[in-house]
A protein has these predicted regions:
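Long, positively charged amphipathic alpha-helical accessory segments at protein N-termini or as interdomain linkers
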Residues: 2-8, 111-159, 164-233
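N-terminal lobe of the biotin/lipoate ligase/transferase fold
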Residues: 1-156, 209-210
Length: 233
């Protein structure tokens, strides 16, 4: 199976949402055509924007509309799963528009592959990403040894958020990996609805900048390998 990988640079959220929808509809129209084309993977950087999933809670937005406008950020209530998150400069946003039927997988397995690809991406930087039971995305934590020798996991912080939509086995929306994201934007929300967990980035964990271009290229390789896809030339 083949996939088209597109780097579209910096694009406003609404414009990219419409672009996703166009690709989504085109892929739906081609279902059952017998081709080896499995879809498109978009890599994009958005200007500052908050998005709330279809079942999200507006109370997780901690600032009002006036403050939002003063900061120069946008807000959209959208049709993906998950709660509230932020997209902005230095963040690798990835939207796989894929036909899961052609890939022979279901939605749960699809999300597992997204998570695994992120875990492998941050591992390239020596970062131990992991899953958190009851939550999607990829997380980091610190393992602390107590005086009695017991080891506990503390300081859970999210490095990648995942929120997707699927209809008739075709996906849209996707993931947001914090490469060099300004994390102050997350202080204005309860990220993904959590009030007891933090947010981090590759840059913060390493103490050196890892930019969008570098991290997105690593992620692309991991996605292609884990979905067993070849990139269309």
């Amino acid at each position: 199976m083949h996939v088209d990988c597109k780097w579209v640079g910096r694009m406003p959220y609404k414009e990219c949402w419409e672009y996703q929808q166009t690709l989504f509809n085109e892929l739906l129209a081609k279902q059952g055509d017998g081709s080896e084309h499995a879809g498109t993977i978009i890599f994009v950087e958005h200007p500052a924007v908050y998005t709330l999933g279809k079942s999200g809670n507006m109370s997780n937005m901690l600032i009002d509309e006036a403050r939002l406008k003063a900061l120069g950020a946008e807000f959209y209530h959208i049709d993906r799963g998950g709660d509230i998150t932020f997209h902005g400069e230095g963040q690798v946003v990835c939207y796989p528009i894929l036909d899961l039927e052609k890939l022979g997988i279901g939605l749960r397995r699809y999300i597992e592959i997204l998570e695994q690809s992120i875990i492998e991406t941050v591992a390239e930087y020596g970062i131990n990403g992991r899953r958190l039971e009851g939550a999607t995305g990829v997380w980091l934590c610190d393992e602390v040894e107590l005086p009695n020798g017991e080891k506990v996991e503390r300081n859970w912080r999210k490095i990648c958020a995942i929120g997707v939509k699927a209809s008739r086995f075709v996906t849209m929306h996707g993931l947001a990996l914090n490469a060099a994201t300004d994390l102050k934007w997350f202080t204005m929300i309860n990220p993904c609805g959590f009030i007891d967990k933090g947010v981090t980035s590759i840059t913060k964990e390493l103490g050196r900048e890892v930019n969008f271009d570098e991290a997105s290229r690593v992620l692309c390789k991991k996605l292609l390998a884990n979905f067993k896809l070849e990139r269309e030339q």
